Amino acid sequence: MPLDLPGPVWVVVPTYDERENLTPLVSAVRAELDEIAPDHTILVVDDSSPDGTGDLADNLAGADSHVRVLHRPEKRGLGPAYIAAFRHALDAGAEFVVEMDADFSHDPSYLPRMLEAALDADLVLGSRYVEGGGVRNWGRIRRIVSRGGCWYARTMLGVPISDLTGGFKVFRRGVLEAIDLDRIRSQGYAFQVELTYRALQMGFRVVEVPIMFTERRAGQSKMTRAIVMEAAWMVPALRRTPPARRTAPAGGLPERHL
């Protein structure tokens, strides 16, 4: 049964060398959204992948009107890819904008619950670190680094969010319109922290939905030392950012966490 959504859903999937994952991911997302959100679009944002991901995305788009492709001339970072996609989706009339990875780390089966949560929230976070969430197929060191990074960001910024670094989210249109995307400075995964923090600064209602994060099925991880270092210095810089003008949360509801 379709959800009572007030507008179109756009799912943004950034890609760089994700040829092995893209076709099954698009099929899985379509299977989840066809019934609950018939008015949906999957926007693949490809940074000129040398493995031919962009060409494959074009073929998928040619065969399916629910798929579109945004080509970028070079690899410029996760943040700029998402910002370009957000603007594209907003210009096309999106009411809900989903961001998710292409490698099945973010299971499309969570989309119905996250979209349902977005009916009375402004930003929904797929959270690994609330009750019911977790990670699979990670080694001890990666678990420590991830947990430590979330604790560091949460403590430094003073926000009641368990998973600030996750990249599975649903934005209501108003959040992306209110945030000055030109002010976003992060290039890598610090982008996730920065967007959520700015939404909280502005008084938007942010909720967390538990997810199980699974290590990628195929391909290579995009995590690098430079990405980790950017996150380390960006968090204190965000703390010094003057509060933005506050905006009333959706429906005037107080914040809560799922």
Predicted regions and their residues:
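Short beta-strand/loop segment that forms part of the nucleotide-sugar
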Residues: 38-49, 70
